[in-house]
Swiss-Prot record:
GO biological process, one term: DNA repair
Span of domain SSB: 1-103
Source species: Streptococcus agalactiae serotype V (strain ATCC BAA-611 / 2603 V/R)
Complex and partners: Homotetramer.
Keyword annotations: DNA damage, DNA recombination, DNA repair, DNA replication, DNA-binding
Gene this chain is encoded by: ssb2
Listed name of the protein: Single-stranded DNA-binding protein 2
Protein's UniProt keywords contain Transcription: no
Short name of one Pfam family: SSB
Residue span of motif Important for interaction with partner proteins: 126-131
Length: 131
């Protein structure tokens, strides 16, 4: 049997890392992943998928991930349960084994500042180089 998740989406908030009582780093995040088809209103719908990361992976995402960051995540689908007020609740989430931020700092800055255009505008032509 095989349990593998690969997704690309955007972080819905700045990831926050916490330490467990045994001093392990854990980061939880939600990733908005657009569906491949449009909904009845003509717009793309998104799924909001909970992700959990442990250790150095958690620390790295907490340091470099920001709200809106385009991210690729590999991992496994996990289900856990807990009791609250006599009710059993189930949570399905992705346990990440790796991730990659898919935007450069310049692309992220353009998105955050709502700058239109593409990165080719930022490249100097040979004639403009001082050497």
């Amino acid at each position: 049997m095989y349990n593998k998740v690969i997704m690309i989406g955007r972080l819905t908030a700045k990831p926050e890392m916490v330490k467990t009582p045994t001093d392990k780093s854990v980061t939880r995040a939600t990733v908005a992943v657009n569906r491949r088809f449009k909904g009845s209103n003509g717009e793309r719908e998104a799924d909001f998928i909970n992700v959990v990361m442990w250790g150095r992976l958690a620390e790295t995402l907490a340091s470099y991930g920001t709200k809106g960051s385009l991210i690729s995540i590999d991992g496994e689908l996990r289900t856990r349960k807990y009791e609250k007020d006599g009710q059993t609740h189930y949570i399905t989430e992705v346990l990440a084994s790796s991730f990659q931020l898919l935007e450069s700092r310049a692309q992220r800055a353009m998105r955050e500042n709502n700058v239109s255009g593409d990165l080719s505008d930022l490249v100097l032509e040979e004639e403009e180089l001082p050497f």
